[in-house]
Amino acid sequence: MEVEAAEARSPAPGYKRSGRRYKCLSCTKTFPNAPRAARHAATHGPADCSEEVAEVKPKPETEAKAEEASGEKVSGSAAKPRPYACPLCPKAYKTAPELRSHGRSHTGEKPFPCPECGRRFMQPVCLRVHLASHAGELPFRCAHCPKAYGALSKLKIHQRGHTGERPYACADCGKSFADPSVFRKHRRTHAGLRPYSCERCGKAYAELKDLRNHERSHTGERPFLCSECGKSFSRSSSLTCHQRIHAAQKPYRCPACGKGFTQLSSYQSHERTHSGEKPFLCPRCGRMFSDPSSFRRHQRAHEGVKPYHCEKCGKDFRQPADLAMHRRVHTGDRPFKCLQCDKTFVASWDLKRHALVHSGQRPFRCEECGRAFAERASLTKHSRVHSGERPFHCNACGKSFVVSSSLRKHERTHRSSEAAGVPPAQELVVGLALPVGVAGESSAAPAAGAGLGDPPAGLLGLPPESGGVMATQWQVVGMTVEHVECQDAGVREAPGPLEGAGEAGGEEADEKPPQFVCRECKETFSTMTLLRRHERSHPELRPFPCTQCGKSFSDRAGLRKHSRTHSSVRPYTCPHCPKAFLSASDLRKHERTHPVPMGTPTPLEPLVALLGMPEEGPA
């Protein structure tokens, strides 16, 4: 009882009462009660506290911050022994409880749950600060924005985002930080301490919580939901940044151009556009980048890594954003809407490109022929007409194509033929796309180096007795001419190019098996026209419906072309008259109505011409 009375009358040696807290006389640490202060004071040893107090001087702010961030504070005038070393990192501590508390940063253990919301914390002091937010106790308010905090330390870290202060500098790379916890995490990257690795892609992290956040990119889990628009996120920080869009908050403003940003990282990347700084260098190709996300995306292109997997179709992607945008193809979500024609798009850049159609801007001009385009991709495709480039090759037959969509359509013919057991049709290899509509008697191909005169009808796959019958649809592919369909009121279906075109009669042609197979029910047809007419009965083969009239199409290009009939958009303008058309093929047909100057020779079009053979000719 006498000991207790003595403790009540005066504090134990090694600490003193300062207001409502107890302050250590050796290191200036404070504690909420006397027992904790006494236990802490015992770690300094039985030194004369009065002499230590005289030696303790206030440290400069920058030195104190660096010590706070590194966890290497010095007690008194000399460093005290730290016998408890962490086996996972270079840190050491004076007591076993301090080491156990530090170990939670490696294991991710959070033994202190919030009774209100269930959120868990590593330290009890963090839980107390969090509980103040539930009680509405946020006494520390930012003077620059409406945010408030329950702890003064959090407010100071937040205010550095407004002032640009970054007092924690890395001695290895010079990078600076505003938050000491982020600085500590960064230092582990130099030490090579990344004990938490992803089982799917092998990526390693220094913190368990970072691994948990990364794993959501593989599983697609997005537990953080925006109450305003319903959009979900995989990280709480992403939700916080997103909510600033609804609140019209852009706390990070560029002093050079006045542009505002919702995220500090976006603001820092924007600053480099003014300075021209590109600090991220690719060691493989030497290319430099101004922001780390572009640099990481570029590195995956070198490595060929596509860790983000679509569960519905099995397609892989390099970026989680690419996977999220791809999923809209399955869900039908098209959140970006044109205000002028109500057309919707999957991605924002598709809407921006579409807006050029309404504005009439065509900034990309061909240097060869002067034709202008609204998109750079359209100019790139058009330039292949002049260069002859056909970069998309079929792995099955070796054919090459100007655009990837033509390759995909061609590959469907292989799949349908394989499903029906029909061998691929033979094709005639020629060097030029010869004019259609000429007829001859011989069926032999011209010898190499011979003069290019009128090709015989048999060479083009027409029956010898057809005379001037026109093949109205031909497809020019690679170095072959493939007969697609021959239509004439009084002429039967034309045989293939190598099916004995010079033989008398049509007995073998009558016995020719059907070549056009339905992809859904495997029924066969003698012409492509009959097949297309039949496939309309299978809605599964037409997965792209028009939202205005309900008509369905087998591919997205057909739907896009059809949707123009509901709007006033006519993107293909005739250079000779004011008329405009829905499609490029309609424009080409119309251009033939304009007279050609007399004496102009009709050159043989190279086989690499994008438009192929003309659809009409002299009978």
Curated annotation (Swiss-Prot):
Function: May be involved in transcriptional regulation. May play a role in DNA repair process.
Keyword field: Acetylation, Disease variant, DNA-binding, Intellectual disability, Isopeptide bond, Metal-binding, Nucleus, Phosphoprotein, Repeat, Transcription, Transcription regulation, Ubl conjugation, Zinc, Zinc-finger
Gene3D superfamilies cross-referenced by the UniProt entry: Classic Zinc Finger
Annotated GO MF terms: DNA-binding transcription repressor activity, RNA polymerase II-specific; RNA polymerase II cis-regulatory region sequence-specific DNA binding; zinc ion binding
Region Disordered, annotated ranges: 34-79, 492-513
Any single Pfam family the record assigns to this protein: zf-C2H2
ZnF segments: C2H2-type: 22-44, 84-106, 112-134, 140-162, 168-190, 196-218, 224-246, 252-274, 280-302, 308-330, 336-358, 364-386, 392-414, 516-538, 544-566, 572-594
SMART domains: ZnF_C2H2
Compositional bias segments (type: Basic and acidic residues): 54-71
Covalent cross-link Glycyl lysine isopeptide (Lys-Gly) (interchain with G-Cter in SUMO2), where: K57, K59, K65, K80, K154, K512
Domain of life: Eukaryota
UniProt entry tagged with the keyword Nucleus: yes
Gene, per the UniProt record: ZNF668
Disorder named in the UniProt entry: Neurodevelopmental disorder with poor growth, large ears, and dysmorphic facies: An autosomal recessive neurodevelopmental disorder characterized by severe global developmental delay, brain malformation, microcephaly, growth deficiency, and distinct facial dysmorphism. Disease severity is variable and death in infancy may occur.
Outcome after substituting A66T: In a breast cancer sample; somatic mutation
Gene Ontology cellular component list: nucleus
UniProt modified residues of type Phosphoserine: S10, S387
Protein name: Zinc finger protein 668
Similarity field: Belongs to the krueppel C2H2-type zinc-finger protein family.
GO annotation terms (biological process): DNA repair; regulation of transcription by RNA polymerase II
N-acetylmethionine: residues carrying this PTM: M1
Compartments where located: Nucleus
